[in-house]
Every structure is written in structure tokens, then in C-alpha cells.
A protein has these predicted regions:
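Extended interaction regions within the primary functional domain
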Residues: 1, 17-20
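Bacterial N-terminal signal peptides that target proteins for export
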Residues: 1-8
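Bacterial N-terminal signal peptides
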Residues: 8-16
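Mature extracellular/passenger domains of Gram-negative fimbrial/pilin and adhesin proteins
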Residues: 21-335
């Protein structure tokens, strides 16, 4: 019995030692701060080309973030982790390029507190020492000389809104085994990209398909995904006129929408939607970069693209009677 008691006591002491050793640090303000990159006004007719690498102005100073480690931290050094949800696509000159959206790859480098260049994403990087780490006092997260590189994989046409997104979430811990659960700061990007390459569709006017009155029971009789009996597709020819885009260029047209079900745009009546298709009635799946209508500009950098559309039942249920509509956006890209 005495041997068993001594073993249990030893195990308890070991567990307590591990709890004191392993600590997760936090932003000293209690709030996760953000280092943001604005991508507006970065691109022009020269660098808006496939394969071009654009280097944003260096953030040369310290990021200005302080962390604090909890009582019980036994060491004066920390580890930093730069975590991302993006997937690394390629590495060029040690920069790890991740696909940020349909148009761009992004990569970053930074210099840490021991004056060593790092190329995130990377976890549990050993940093320098600071006596405040073990004293439960704020200390600087000494990241500086941040360099953000962008690689164009698909040139922009017109204006593209890039919503604010987090590229890296930065964590500070006292061991390389602590969980990454409390962000200290983030590195984000976003902005409105406007380039000289411009294409105007339908002379800037809205393309409208009006199907008039359709009996509600016809939609339920048609079933999910089907067009009601007696309703014919409508056809529109969309005039495309481009500026600062080479004549005879190969382009594509695709569809963007906020509410989508399979290949259909969902209307403001959730039981109903619309299919938009090419001249052969092949649907264009909204928000799918690979679902496009290819076309070629003529010698005057112009073209006409045929669109067809028809209403369908989304759910197969009898819809509530009344007007219904959906709004989509046509986007032109380079092939």
C-alpha cells in the first residue's frame, strides 16, 4: 500500500509541473489586434498580367502588438505560430504562395525578434527572450519588416471587390506543445481592385428576363429543378465592349449570385429560382469559376454573347403566390 501511495504522489507532482510549464499567452489588451493590407490601387495595366509578382510596400516598423503570459510561466522565451486556412500552392524564393481568391496567390515574409527572416505559415518558431514573459507583464511581439507579395494567376477586368479576410492568425505560447487557441493578432487583406482593363456589358444597362404571370401549381407539378409546363426560355444577346483589352482576346463570362441552389439562382421566393444558360441551354452554375461561356473579341475589342434563362421550381412545393425575382451579376474574365 505504501508503494502505491508514493506512485500516486509522484504522478500528481508531474502533472502539476506540466501545468505550470505549459502556458498560452494572449494579447495584453485582451483584444486580438489586426495588421491589415489594403489591396486597392495596387494593380495597373503593367502588373495586371498572368505570372506577375507584385510586392506591396514594406511595413518596416514593429507591428505594435504586446502579449502577456499567465502566472506560472517559468521561461522568458516564447514560441510564435502563424496559422492560415489557405493552402500553399507553390514556393518561390522561400515565399509560400497560397491561393487567396480566383485571381491571386499571396505570400509573406517577416523578421522576428531575433532578427531572423521567416516565411509563414509556420508553427512554434522559437523567439528571443524578455524578462516580462515569466512575470505576467506585457512584452512586445517583435514582428517587423512585413513583406506581402501577390502573384497574379488570372488578370482582373473592371472592378473586383475583395472582402476582408484573415491571412494569418498569430499565436504566442511558452512551449512548442501548447494548444493554439488564443490569437494575439491577425494579418488580413482586402480592398477594391480597379484596373484599366475594362469591359462594359449591355451598354451598362441591366439585362432583364420577364416571364409574366405563371400559375403557382405549375411549379409544384414540374418538380424540383424543372421548368413549369408551357413556359419557354427567353434569349438575350449581351453586347460586350472592352477598353484596354487586346483585340481578338479570348475571354469568358460567368455568373455570380448571393443565393444559389445547384445550378440555379434562388429568388426572393425560396421555392422558386432561375437557370441562366448559354445558347445551347447548358446552365451556367453561379459562383463557379469553371462554369463559363467562352467568347472571343473581334478586331474592335467587342463581342456578343447569347444568354438564355428560364424559371424553375427549387423545392417542388407549391410556392406562395405573388411576384418573385432574383438578381445576379455577369463577370467577364480572361480565359
Amino acid at each position: 500500500m505504501k508503494i502505491i501511495c508514493r506512485l500516486l504522489l509522484a504522478m500528481a507532482c508531474l502533472c502539476l509541473a506540466n501545468i505550470s510549464w505549459a502556458t498560452v499567452c494572449a494579447n495584453s489588451t485582451g483584444v486580438t489586434e489586426d495588421e491589415h493590407y489594403d489591396l486597392s490601387n495596387i494593380f495597373n495595366s503593367t502588373n495586371n498580367q498572368p505570372g506577375q509578382i507584385v510586392v506591396l510596400p514594406e511595413k518596416s516598423g514593429w507591428v505594435g502588438v504586446s502579449a502577456i503570459c499567465p502566472p506560472g510561466t517559468l521561461v522568458n522565451y516564447t514560441y510564435r505560430s502563424y496559422v492560415t486556412n489557405f493552402i500553399v500552392q507553390e514556393t518561390i524564393d522561400n515565399y509560400k504562395y497560397m491561393q487567396l481568391n480566383d485571381y491571386l496567390l499571396g505570400a509573406m515574409s517577416l523578421v522576428d525578434s531575433v532578427m531572423d527572416i521567416k516565411f509563414p505559415p509556420q508553427n512554434y518558431i522559437r523567439m528571443g527572450t524578455d524578462p516580462n514573459v515569466s512575470q505576467n507583464l506585457p512584452f512586445g511581439v517583435m514582428d517587423s519588416r512585413l513583406i506581402f507579395r501577390l502573384k497574379v494567376i488570372r488578370p482582373f477586368i473592371n472592378m473586383v471587390e475583395i472582402p476582408r479576410q484573415v491571412m494569418f492568425t498569430v499565436y504566442v505560447t511558452s512551449t512548442p506543445y501548447d494548444p493554439l487557441v488564443t490569437p494575439v493578432y491577425t494579418i488580413s487583406f482586402g480592398g477594391r481592385v480597379e484596373v484599366p482593363q475594362n469591359c462594359e456589358l449591355n451598354a451598362g444597362q441591366i439585362v432583364e428576363f420577364d416571364f409574366g404571370d405563371i400559375g403557382a401549381s405549375l411549379f409544384s407539378a414540374a418538380g424540383p429543378g424543372n421548368r413549369p409546363a408551357g413556359v419557354m426560355p427567353q434569349t438575350k444577346s449581351i453586347a460586350v465592349k472592352c477598353t484596354n483589352v487586346a483585340a481578338q482576346a479570348y475571354l469568358t463570362m460567368r455568373l455570380e449570385a448571393s443565393a444559389v441552389s445547384g445550378q440555379a439562382m434562388v429568388s426572393d421566393n425560396q421555392d422558386l429560382g432561375f437557370i441562366v444558360a448559354d445558347q445551347n441551354d447548358t446552365p451556367i452554375t453561379p459562383n463557379d469559376l469553371n462554369s463559363v461561356i467562352p467568347f472571343r473579341l473581334d478586331a474592335a475589342a467587342a463581342a456578343n454573347v447569347t444568354l438564355r434563362a428560364w424559371p424553375i421550381s427549387i423545392t417542388g412545393q407549391k410556392p406562395t403566390e405573388g411576384p418573385f425575382s432574383a438578381l445576379g451579376y455577369l463577370r467577364v474574365d480572361y480565359q
